[in-house]
Amino acid sequence: MCGIVGVVGNTNATDILIQGLEKLEYRGYDSAGIFVLDGADNHLVKAVGRIAELSAKTAGVEGTTGIGHTRWATHGKPTEDNAHPHRSETERFVLVHNGVIENYLEIKEEYLAGHHFKGQTDTEIAVHLIGKFAEEDGLSVLEAFKKALHIIRGSYAFALIDSENPDVIYVAKNKSPLLIGLGEGYNMVCSDAMAMIRETNQYMEIHDQELVIVKADSVEVQDYDGNSRERASYTAELDLSDIGKGTYPYYMLKEIDEQPTVMRKLIQAYTDDAGQVVIDPAIIKAVQDADRIYILAAGTSYHAGFASKKMLEELTDTPVELGISSEWGYGMPLLSKKPLFIFISQSGETADSRQVLVKANEMGIPSLTVTNVPGSTLSREANYTMLLHAGPEIAVASTKAYTAQIAALAFLAKAVGEANGNAKAQAFDLVHELSIVAQSIESTLSEKETIEAKVRELLETTRNAFYIGRGQDYYVAMEASLKLKEISYIQCEGFAAGELKHGTIALIEEGTPVLALLSDPVLANHTRGNIQEVAARGAKVLTIAEENVAKDTDDIVLTTVHPYLSPISMVVPTQLVAYFATLHRGLDVDKPRNLAKSVTVE
């Protein structure tokens, strides 16, 4: 949520800021702004809406130093007054901020009596506080910033400019992502390496409660007490071509189409030349040592955990429990004696999951992060990491990351099972079976026109819909319903088909769309009984079935794949259902309202 970009020492500062903010659009925002300095001249430009609207207002704005921000409203409505950057009382200091300041009202009452505020944000309180300490109390800029940081409670990533000294950006963070980008003769600040991919692939991490003084030719890292911290840079393996849409109208469609390639990349990443599964032995041992696996995640990643639960349990001989990170952060249940926490997060920055990880580290619980972003916070702070190798996922609605998460966990389960001598794991030819999955997805993708026609007939005008399934198909139904509701705004719920008669069937009326998923030969006929129940009450039914359970009347038929991997192939047509339903409603597929790609506040 939200994004920060900053640059010092580059004559193309405005262009760098705008292009950086464009690359952060996927994170979600409702307004944006930049502040640019060129010597004594400075320019503050804000806009509500898209970056294109901000860019149109920056003609003639030039400078060598600046900060930019995309805002997702948490305090105050999306207006230009509330958009960042914000200025201090005298307008000398300018600040952008991601996160939530928990004690901003206390700060306002205790320190800022008589100050005049233009908006209703917690960020404006912070920059006024810094300004007060520097201009009213006579502290140096650095000491004023430090004093403010000691007072402020909450999550934050700050980038501060002193208009009287345009050669430096002051940066600090706590529980919110922020990086330093290292350029040739200039340096940068960004929430995400993707924002600066055009400028550099060299980055420096900032840890919690660290302050960084960024100049064109130097970067100095300190703790809040002024003690220097040594920090090496690292290279981010990102490709500029990966983050473009190419010939696609939307990122989501591109990312759906990339899924067969992602499956094959995972095979390459987690097998050796002989085709044997290769996982870090330390990760295998961590799973072997655990008496219970706890998967912590949110949203789509949570659903991927459910879809992987049976496979993990059967192949590793270890019980698996699922937890919603936002719930566990405030109330961790009674744990087993030797737990292992697995965090699933596309971005590796999910604030709710990090809150749990911090507690796990304090308790000495071993942890594994499964993420798409190397060097992300969850990756750095967990004991172990498995990467998804899916490439940047830009669309807010996750597609390829979900399928990659299940596939990555399959490699983990296979490796641990083989190490344990588990017969099912030894018989599970994952490389072969995942190759079949890739082919199945390609076959589904070739039927886009057929799927689009069925979606137009079923969903174009409806306000409600249901997905149903049993077993693994129920977990896919959960993800399918989330995908449909989050981008098409159709109120959709995913249910275990057997639960219909326990209440949900009361919502079925003439014309209600019900989408049924069938892949398990043992359960398919039971689900077909539920289909008959809803059809008898007037529901319009669309069935998605694997060949081994398909009937001539089914609408979408998929290649049969291994049961452990069926959630990967079964979810793809539901992704297309969501895409086409949204497209034919004239909505923005990639940027649904009120949602952010990376949820970095609790």
From Swiss-Prot:
Principal location class: cytoplasm
EC numbers, comma separated: 2.6.1.16
Entry annotated with the keyword Transferase: yes
Assigned GO CC terms: cytosol
Enzyme class label: transferase
Domain Glutamine amidotransferase type-2: start-end pairs: 2-217
Function (record text): Catalyzes the first step in hexosamine metabolism, converting fructose-6P into glucosamine-6P using glutamine as a nitrogen source.
Protein name as it appears in the record: Glutamine--fructose-6-phosphate aminotransferase [isomerizing]
Gene responsible for this protein: glmS
